[in-house]
Amino acid sequence: MNADAVNIVSTVIFVIAVLHTFSTKYFEDLANKSNHHSGFWHLLGEVEIVFGLWALVLTCFLYAYKDKSFAVQYLEAQNYTEPAFVFVVMVISASKPIFDFCLNMVIRISSALPFDKTVTTFFVTLSLVPLLGSFITEPAAMTLAALMLKKNFYDKGISSKMMYATIGVLFVNISIGGTLTPYAAPPILMVAAKWNWDFIHMIQSFGWRSTIAVILNALMLTLLFRSEIKQIKFQDESTHSQIAPQSVIGIHLLFLAGVVFFAHHTVIFVGLFLFFIGFTTAYGKYQSKLLIRESLLVGFFLAGLVVLGGQQKWWLEPLLKSLNPDVVYYGAIALTAITDNAALTYLGSLVEGLSEEFKYALVAGAVTGGGLTVIANAPNPAGYSILKGSFKEGAISPLLLFINAIPSTLIAIICFKFL
């Protein structure tokens, strides 16, 4: 493990950025107390800003310590396809026609179940939607599930305890629910092509296990809070979802499918996105405000993580090489909590000669730990951004999120490791 000054300083900056993500509530408190600099403290309290801010610090260091050419070459050498993809797919999937389509699906399935409708809606939102993420991508599923939870439950004054328990299950289920296909989950997307993982492989190795875990997590949470859920006044919105014509919904779904199909080709999916913006403008009466700001913040978060993560290979790769498959599974869960799981699996894919058992352990560990922190899984900032306004002082406690994600993570461990 040979490290030069750039490696060491970059890792120090990365550690500071991670600590910053756990301190955003402190900055929000300062913002509420400050009269003259509340805007600045609010900025530092935005978890989506953290990695972009410290990526700027790293860039300034590279410029000062090396030179302009070195800093620019480093930035241009990184791959920003995933941040751009997440931004685009978030905006499209959160558009009103697609949201109405998925909401209508949830309502229909919930109504078909022979139980209280509010309870079944809660259960289906936390089970079906995360599994749907295997087909519409995890960022899209996170956006839809978070919007549904906010509208149907978080905005109805549920307890803080239920809020944290729900977001803990949501983050874990989204992370593991996208493993039925090789393109939906960012940590799998990073390795599927190189390791030749196709749809069949994903179903056989990951899909059935993740389905069991997702359903168990959603079921246990629903049973735990069923009394509180039943007290929520649930409004039937099945007619609301039919406002947009089927043709408009179909075109939105085609745009989403096109973006997913060309997920590796930035020029194409950005072009499709521009056409999508034009279409929503032409048929504005069927649209609501697009989720541009929130999506940009999430994309900025991920881009900053890419810049900072690119300098962590010097310690992460030798660490992975020193572990056996059993240790790497639990090690990946732990490392995922402090690093993006897609970055972790990508670095693992750079190591040659890995056994199939090692590959499974690395990816399974990465998705298992994807709900423990906001930075653990690429779609998490999307859910955080949508739901944080419902929490006290507009911030989500990283510690309480971590604690509430542990039970669901343990269920995922049982399914991925022992089934």
Where in the sequence are the language-model features?
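Interfacial loop-to-helix junctions that mark the boundaries of transmembrane helices
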Residues: M1-I8, F40-V47, K68-P83, F199-R209, ...
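Juxtamembrane and boundary regions of transmembrane helices in multi-pass small-molecule transporters
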Residues: N2, V6-K33, Y164, G168, ...
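Hydrophobic mid-bilayer segments of alpha-helices in multi-pass membrane transport proteins
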Residues: I8-Y26, E46-A64, Q78-V91, L144, ...
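Flexible interhelical linker loops that connect adjacent transmembrane helices
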Residues: H36-S38, L224-V248, G284-I292
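Transmembrane alpha-helix boundary signature
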Residues: T59-Y74, V89-R108, L131-T143, G310-P318
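Transmembrane helical segments that form the transport core of multi-pass membrane transport proteins
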Residues: Y65-K68, V72-Q73, F99-D100, H252-E356
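Helix-loop-helix module between adjacent transmembrane segments
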Residues: M90-K96, D116-K117, L128-A140, V172-T181, ...
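Hydrophobic transmembrane alpha-helices that form the pore/transport pathway of multi-pass ion
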Residues: T120-I176, M190, Y346-A364, I386-T409, ...
